Design a protein with these regions (language model features):
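Conserved hydrophobic core/spine positions of the Hanks-type protein kinase catalytic domain
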Residues: 115-122
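ATP-binding glycine-rich loop module of kinase domains
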Residues: 18-60
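C-lobe/activation-segment region of protein kinase-like
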Residues: 125-129, 140-160
């Protein structure tokens, strides 16, 4: 995939208009997209090298991680559709500011740290870590969402 932002992407034959690039992560590009009625996050898996992380089957990993976190009870956007062939995921769009942006604007509340700690309690009891980078958390209506699906087996050096 080139660095140009696509104007349209499909998921299992359904077309979505791309509004903007939300971000690029280790495993893919996340776009704000619309079907004309609702807004979604449409993630396109990429295969660009990452010097500090080894991937297997990225699209299957996303699905497995989503199901693992859902079972644990982590507050996150719903996976609405997955297109295995084109390596695309359609997610619920959680509108709000990232913790990263809130830190920059000095708008972080102690309740958000408490919500992360509550997530950690669930995660650690299930031998799981998530990616705690501040751009992976969005606040909507005072609720903190983990918007990435990445998770791994618990390792002390990666805990919160």
């Amino acid at each position: 995939m080139s660095n140009a932002i696509p104007t349209e992407l499909s998921v299992n034959g359904k077309n979505y208009s791309v509004i903007k690039l939300l971000g690029k992560g280790k495993g893919g590009y996340s776009y704000l997209a619309s079907d004309g009625t609702n807004q979604y996050v449409l993630k396109q898996i990429h295969h660009e090298p990452c010097s500090y992380y080894q991937f297997g089957d990225k699209i299957q990993s996303e699905l497995n991680d989503y199901n693992r976190l859902k079972k644990i009870g982590i507050t996150m956007p719903k996976m609405l559709d997955i297109d295995i062939e084109n390596e695309r995921i359609l997610k619920e769009y959680i509108e709000g500011d990232t913790i990263f942006d809130m830190v920059k604007a000095d708008r972080v509340k102690s309740e958000y740290a408490e919500q992360v700690k509550a997530m950690c309690k669930l995660l650690y009891a299930n031998n799981t870590n998530i990616d705690y980078f501040p751009t992976n958390f969005v606040v909507q209506n005072e609720t903190l969402y983990y918007i990435d699906y990445e998770c791994n087996d618990y390792m002390e050096e990666w805990n919160f």
